[in-house]
């Protein structure tokens, strides 16, 4: 059941990537593919790959979306006009996503839902069960954010520079718009550029 729920939207979204006429839609359709694929990896027990898969690929989608919008000259006003048209579809997709989340999660992890009464406090304590076993994700997170935090921040700065470079490269400057060079305007001496014009007083006869 869970396999079909996760795999079916991934297949449909993968087909819509190739069939979408709007380039913006073809860029956005891989997001459900990566989301459902990370869910399948989570079911297989590969928690680290399930976490890193959407982070890396959705970041790449954000950069490609930036390139598509800036290189194809898509008007933002046209995108805003179509937002209301896709609100029902996005609402249905959001409800399906939340239904999947509540279907997968166990009731014991949600304290508001009715669960079985906790009777472990009435029994004797088994200390062997108190020993905590670290998962792969917890171990990598502990090492990454504790001992290798600097190496975690350096790639983020490199990606920031790459994104700024992409914006600068795809930015089109037109000659019709009047612009001012702020540095030259501040460097000009006003006493040499502004001339005082004196006029003779009018004489009335």
Swiss-Prot record:
One of its GO terms (molecular function) is NADH dehydrogenase (ubiquinone) activity. This is NADH-ubiquinone oxidoreductase chain 6. It is a multi-pass membrane protein. GO terms for cellular component: mitochondrial membrane. Complex I is composed of about 45 different subunits. The chain crosses the membrane at residues 48-68, 86-106, 150-170. It holds the Pfam family Oxidored_q3. Keywords: Electron transport, Membrane, Mitochondrion, NAD, Respiratory chain, Translocase, Transmembrane, Transmembrane helix, Transport, Ubiquinone. Signal peptide: none annotated. Its EC number is 7.1.1.2. It catalyses: a ubiquinone + NADH + 5 H(+)(in) = a ubiquinol + NAD(+) + 4 H(+)(out). InterPro entries: NADH_UbQ/plastoQ_OxRdtase_su6 (IPR001457), Nuo/plastoQ_OxRdtase_6_NuoJ (IPR042106). The keyword Transmembrane helix applies. Core subunit of the mitochondrial membrane respiratory chain NADH dehydrogenase (Complex I) that is believed to belong to the minimal assembly required for catalysis. Complex I functions in the transfer of electrons from NADH to the respiratory chain. The immediate electron acceptor for the enzyme is believed to be ubiquinone. It comes from the Eukaryota. Belongs to the complex I subunit 6 family.
């Amino acid at each position: 059941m869970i396999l079909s729920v996760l795999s079916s939207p991934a297949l449909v979204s993968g087909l819509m990537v190739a069939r979408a006429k709007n380039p913006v839609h073809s860029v956005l359709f891989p997001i459900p593919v990566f989301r459902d694929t990370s869910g399948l990896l989570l079911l297989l027990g590969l928690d680290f790959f399930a976490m890193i898969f959407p982070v890396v690929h959705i970041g790449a989608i954000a950069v490609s979306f930036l390139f598509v919008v800036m290189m194809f000259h898509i008007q933002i006003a046209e995108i805003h006009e179509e937002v209301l048209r896709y609100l029902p579809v996005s609402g249905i997709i959001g409800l399906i996503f939340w239904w999947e989340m509540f279907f997968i999660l166990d009731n014991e992890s949600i304290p508001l839902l009715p669960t079985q009464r906790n009777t472990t406090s009435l029994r004797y304590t088994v200390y062997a069960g108190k020993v905590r076993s670290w998962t792969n994700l917890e171990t990598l997170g502990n090492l990454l954010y504790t001992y290798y935090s600097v190496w975690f921040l350096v790639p983020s700065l490199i990606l920031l520079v790459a994104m700024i470079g992409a914006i600068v490269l795809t930015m089109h400057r037109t000659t019709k718009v009047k612009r001012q060079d702020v540095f030259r305007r501040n460097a000009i001496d006003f006493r040499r550029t502004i001339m005082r014009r004196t006029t003779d007083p009018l004489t009335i006869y």
